Swiss-Prot record:
Known function: Anticoagulant plasma protein; it is a cofactor to activated protein C in the degradation of coagulation factors Va and VIIIa. It helps to prevent coagulation and stimulating fibrinolysis.
Compartment(s) where it occurs, according to its Swiss-Prot or TrEMBL record: Secreted
Domain Gla per the UniProt entry, residue ranges: 42-87
Post-translational modifications: The iron and 2-oxoglutarate dependent 3-hydroxylation of aspartate and asparagine is (R) stereospecific within EGF domains.
Organism field: Rattus norvegicus
Protein name: Vitamin K-dependent protein S
Domain EGF-like per the UniProt entry, residue ranges: 117-155, 157-200, 201-242, 243-283
Propeptide: 25-41
Residues where (3R)-3-hydroxyaspartate is found: D136
Family annotation (InterPro entries): Coagulation_fac-like_Gla_dom, ConA-like_dom_sf, EGF-like_Ca-bd_dom, EGF-like_dom, EGF-type_Asp/Asn_hydroxyl_site, EGF_Ca-bd_CS, GAS-SHBG-PROS, GLA-like_dom_SF
UniProt-listed GO biological process terms: blood coagulation; fibrinolysis; liver development; negative regulation of coagulation; positive regulation of phagocytosis; positive regulation of phosphatidylinositol 3-kinase/protein kinase B signal transduction; response to axon injury; response to lipopolysaccharide
One cellular component term from this protein's GO annotations in UniProt: extracellular space
Annotated glycan sites: N499, N509
Length: 675
């Protein structure tokens, strides 16, 4: 059988050689139908007893699938091998196309092609990057993966950075996955430690001391910052701090003043505005204590103007007329002119005034000149009826219809001319400059009121109509003793603060008795040119029911007292003593004064200014920029001022606003309760 089989195969080979080339690539129909049929060959008995051998069975001879199974002795390998075996036969048969050889991986010969078939790892089925080795199996293979790879062919990288059992791969910052592995990295500004997992911040400020130039270098985790003081912004191009112009950003509601490192907002206090709590917007200054500002047109105010007369009347009466004046009078003032009468040629005159609270009469006629002061003190703030009447040989003065003085005289006070007595009468003040003609000089200003006047026995003829038509000539219905600042003007004084006997050189000792009607305003200010080197001011506190007392040196607070209730019926006392070495602020109700940490520098600035000329203002500041001092609103309310032991009299001011009352202040308005 073996010999016949061999001969048969040789015959097939010979037949193949003589077949046309067009048929060499294909099996016959009959042969092809038998390829997948398992037929056991008729081998010799000795050959059948041997174990199957690939070389002997399928290379030296042609084998069918059954014979191939004898080699592998299992179906999986046989099923895997035999189709590929047929491919090798087709590729290496004589005259086969080169394309067939290429399909068999270009093995050099049939033996190489067939021997390679049983090795499942050839060609390599595993991923080249991920496999460590390939293990051949029965019609199968097993890829052994390198660390960091997975999959049946080691084709999938393991992302160690997402391993739930080792969060972030154990990296303190960044975990970077790589094919088959991973590594830790640090963010910019950090350096890797030797354990290759943890990161440490890099201190750029120490490594590069000049990295910020003139700014301050501040190390932060992973980076650094170049810091500038408040009000400055870092400029990386010049490595320096540049001032921020906050005013260019429309920061303030009204006036904004930029300065190196900051800015300040100001509101026009003279128009009734103050800086709000946000230090940017402006709001109206509220009334904190309502005063009784009601007036009566029948009450003539004698000190409506700073200088000059309040009212002028001229009488032309029969020559038998004698001078007479009767009126009700109210004042707290101690000195001033009530009325002045004179003839048309100014040769004869009569003065009725108040000195030290008592009635004083001065007169001059063609025969004599006299002055007399007497009677009771009447500057008590109540209404007193005063009458002055010329008799035949004397002048009679009565208060409340009781004679207090009787002045002898020769002749008439005023000489008739052409059958008429022409007389001019001036209320409160002197016409022209006649002070030098007086027997004894007197303050022409008088803060007082008159009513019910009867002049030359003509009643109120001529005067009533004038008084009724002018509101500023009317008196408040009720007043108290004190000086009144209406919140619309100031008074100026010239005060020398230098004390040659004092080692401190200059001294400002101020005592104020105040009853404000608004909680914001300048009480006292020293002005030098366009600057305000010193100011004592009130500001409404945040509570809305109390006030803060502030001492300003130029534009900064040197000392302040917080949350004091000053808007009440009872006046409050305030003291401020300051020289080049120290500052003391005091009130009887609060002792917890807050002083500036920069006080000594502020005092040095003030000391330099006080060596020059300063003007003293009460009730506000003059018409300078309202950025000259943080508070520029006029003070409103009652206030009496003592500076360096001298009680200031507004009648002695260099100038004062017409509406400032020197010796009277409106009473607090009484709130009527409804029951």
């Amino acid at each position: 059988m073996r010999v016949l089989s061999v001969r048969f195969r040789v015959l097939l080979a010979c037949l193949a050689l003589v077949l046309p080339n067009s048929e060499t690539n294909f099996l016959s129909k009959e042969r092809a139908s038998q390829v997948l049929v398992r037929k056991r060959r008729a081998n010799t008995l000795l050959e059948e007893t041997k174990k199957g051998n690939l070389e002997r069975e399928c290379i030296e001879e042609l084998c069918n699938k059954e014979e191939a199974r004898e080699v592998f002795e299992n179906n999986p390998e046989t099923d895997y091998f035999y189709p590929k075996y047929l491919g090798c036969l087709g590729a290496f048969r004589v005259g086969a196309f080169s394309a067939a050889r290429q399909s068999a991986n270009a093995y050099p010969d049939l033996r190489s092609c067939v021997n390679a078939i049983p090795d499942q790892c050839d060609p390599m089925p595993c991923n080249e990057d991920g496999y460590l080795s390939c293990k051949d199996g029965q019609g199968a293979f097993t890829c052994i993966c390198k660390p960091g790879w997975q999959g049946d062919k080691c084709q999938f990288d393991i992302n160690e950075c997402k391993d739930p059992s080792n969060i972030n791969g154990g990296c303190s910052q960044t975990c970077d996955n790589t094919p088959g592995s991973y590594h830790c990295s640090c963010k910019i500004g950090f350096a890797m430690l030797t354990n290759k997992k943890d990161c440490k911040d890099v201190d750029e400020c120490s490594l590069k001391p000049s990295v910020c130039g003139t700014a301050v270098c501040k190390n932060i985790p992973g980076d650094f910052e170049c810091e500038c003081p408040n009000g400055y912004r870092y400029d990386p191009s010049s490595k320096s701090c540049k001032d921020v112009d906050e005013c260019s950003e429309n920061t303030c509601a009204q006036l904004c003043v930029n300065y190196p490192g900051g800015y300040s907002c100001y509101c026009d206090g003279k128009k009734g505005f103050k800086l709000a709590q946000d230090q940017r917007s402006c709001e109206g200054i509220p009334v904190c204590l309502s005063l009784d500002l009601d007036k009566n047109y029948e009450l003539l105010y004698l000190a409506e103007q700073f200088a000059g007369v309040v009212l002028y009347l001229k009488f032309r009466l029969p020559d038998i007329t004698r001078f007479s004046a009767e009126f009700d009078f109210r004042t707290y003032d101690s000195e001033g002119i009530i009325l002045y009468a004179e003839s048309l040629d100014h040769s004869n005159w009569l003065l009725i005034a108040l000195r030290e609270g008592k009635i004083e009469v001065q007169f001059k006629n063609e025969f004599s000149t006299q002055i007399t002061t007497g009677g009771n003190v009447i500057n008590n703030g109540i209404w007193n009826m005063v009458s002055v009447e010329e008799l035949d040989d004397s002048v009679s003065i009565k208060i409340a219809k009781e004679a207090v003085m009787n002045i002898n005289k020769l002749g008439s006070l005023f000489k008739p001319t052409d059958g008429f007595l022409d007389t001019k009468i001036y209320f409160a003040g002197l016409p022209r400059k006649v002070e030098s003609a007086l027997i004894k000089p007197i303050n022409p200003r008088l803060d007082g009121c008159i009513r019910g006047w009867n002049l030359m026995k003509q009643g109120a003829l001529g005067a009533k109509e004038i008084v009724e038509g002018k509101q500023n000539k009317h008196c408040f219905l009720t007043v108290e003793k004190g000086s009144y600042y209406p919140g619309s003007g100031i008074a100026q004084f010239s005060i020398d603060y230098n004390n040659v006997t004092n080692a401190e050189g200059w001294q400002i000792n101020v005592t104020l008795n105040i009853r404000p009607s608004t909680g914001t305003g300048v009480m006292l200010a020293l002005v030098s040119g366009d600057t305000v080197p010193f100011a004592l001011s009130l500001v409404d506190s945040g509570s809305g029911t109390s006030q803060d007392i502030l001492v300003f040196v130029e534009n900064s607070v040197a000392a302040h007292l917080e949350a004091i209730t000053l808007c009440s019926e009872q006046p409050s006392q305030l003291k401020c003593n300051i020289n080049r070495n120290g500052l003391e602020l005091w009130t009887p109700v609060r002792k917890d004064v807050i002083y500036s940490k920069d006080l000594q520098r502020q005092l040095a600035i003030l000391d330099k200014t006080m060596k020059g000329t300063v003007a003293t203002y009460l009730g506000g500041v003059p018409d300078i920029s309202f950025s000259a001092t943080p508070v520029n609103a006029f003070y409103s309310g009652c206030m009496e001022v003592n500076i360096n032991g001298v009680q200031l009299d507004l009648d002695e001011a260099i100038s004062k606003h017409n509406d400032i009352r020197a010796h009277s202040c409106p009473s607090v308005r009484k709130i009527q309760k409804n029951f």
